[in-house]
Amino acid sequence: MQTRNTFSWIKEQITRSISASLMIYIITRTSISNAYPIFAQQGYENPREATGRIVCANCHLANKPVDIEVPQAVLPDTVFEAVVRIPYDTQLKQVLANGKKGGLNVGAVLILPEGFELAPPDRISPEIKEKMGNLSFQSYRPNQKNILVIGPVPGQKYSEITFPILSPDPATKKDIHFLKYPIYVGGNRGRGQIYPDGSKSNNTVYNATASGIVSKILRKEKGGYEITIADASDGRQVVDIIPPGPELLVSEGESIKLDQPLTSNPNVGGFGQGDAEIVLQDPLRVQGLLFFFAAVILAQIFLVLKKKQFEKVQLSEMNF
């Protein structure tokens, strides 16, 4: 009986350990994989402001390039590629949250016209799937299927991101028309400088909050500094906290001014946005255009044949 109780207790403990480990894994993985989209999704109903600015620029302060490539025109109910390129020097290392150096991650938000959406898996060709890799896209909101987000993902592997897009069919969606539509994109590489709550990350420069003399610099056990500034005017002391990551530029006894940089700027990433245009083409218009081209070609052929026939008649009359 005692042996049975012991085995039951061991089994219960193992089950609890596995459950706890699984929960930690899920929570950690979710926080890492969703970090980029959640910052924008939680704070903004729409990622693109009325001014045209994409809200990611509020946290990623450095301006960097981004490029998007889409077909000039697509037919209704067709899967096509939207390729977003986020170029950067892959040799660069960024400051991580713990102050150590690591590789840059990338993320992107793609704002499609109404009606355009992520292609379902069964409609994506093997060629496009190969270009996509193991990426997992999601909608910005459940009711905003035309706005897609991805990231953060490793920049070395995914500096070029292929979105599989399904075009709408005006035959089934009456609010969709055969027109030229704009597409907007935002892409970042590296961590941001400001969190959504307005606080600074450790991936930015820290400035002095007072002018005076640096009376003390205390290096923290887990990294970072406490810098004590003695205000020369009233003698009060101000303590500036520097997190792990940025390199210190000042030393004890140094005279500094208000807003003078206390650290270097460790940021090597940045955010960029761009746009493109795509035409939702009417198949009947394409067929009509092809018919017109065929008619022109046939007319040219008949003219050539008629000309040769006329030349033969003229030649025979001259010989006669």
Swiss-Prot record:
User: Where does the chain cross the membrane?
Assistant: 286-306
Keywords tagged on the record: Chloroplast, Electron transport, Heme, Iron, Membrane, Metal-binding, Photosynthesis, Plastid, Signal, Thylakoid, Transmembrane, Transmembrane helix, Transport
Q: What Gene3D superfamilies would the database entry show?
A: 2.40.50.100, Cytochrome f large domain, Single helix bin
Query: SUPFAM superfamilies attached here?
Result: Cytochrome f subunit of the cytochrome b6f complex, transmembrane anchor (SSF103431), Cytochrome f, large domain (SSF49441), Rudiment single hybrid motif (SSF51246)
- Name any one GO molecular function: iron ion binding
Q: Where does the signal sequence lie?
A: 1-35
Q: How is the cofactor bound?
A: Binds 1 heme group covalently.
Q: Which PANTHER family match?
A: CYTOCHROME F, PTHR33288
List the HAMAP family hit by this protein, alphabetically: Cytb6_f_cytF
Q: Could you tell me what this protein is called? A: Cytochrome f
Designated gene of the protein: petA
